[in-house]
Amino acid sequence: MAAKIRRQDEVIVLAGKDQGKRGKVSQVLTTGKLIVEGINLVKKHQKPNPQLGVAGGIVEQEAPIQASNVAIFNSATGKADRVGFRFEDGKKVRFFKSNSELVK
């Protein structure tokens, strides 16, 4: 089955502490989760590792967010949207359900 949300898609958060925020998908995990730039930031306590040249301290990084808590953002309508699939010229393409435009 093809993925409705893919890397580099702009998404909007529907539920959780970051509700209403938008960001680009940087990674899609096989567990049904996504990593979105600037969303679901957590503080991680990093131990120093002199062999790798990593300094210790508290690092802020993106944690995975459940795919059901985000929706793809339609820039034409300015709202969250649903995605459908159809065949055009023998290729399977994604389109927005609200206005039938292709997802870029």
Curated annotation (Swiss-Prot):
Keywords: Ribonucleoprotein, Ribosomal protein, RNA-binding, rRNA-binding. It holds the Pfam family KOW. GO terms for cellular component: ribonucleoprotein complex; ribosome. CDD domains: KOW_RPL26. SUPFAM superfamilies: Translation proteins SH3-like domain. One of its GO terms (molecular function) is rRNA binding. One of its GO terms (biological process) is translation. HAMAP family: Ribosomal_uL24_B. Part of the 50S ribosomal subunit. Belongs to the universal ribosomal protein uL24 family. One of two assembly initiator proteins, it binds directly to the 5'-end of the 23S rRNA, where it nucleates assembly of the 50S subunit. One of the proteins that surrounds the polypeptide exit tunnel on the outside of the subunit. This is Large ribosomal subunit protein uL24. It comes from Shewanella piezotolerans (strain WP3 / JCM 13877). The gene is rplX.
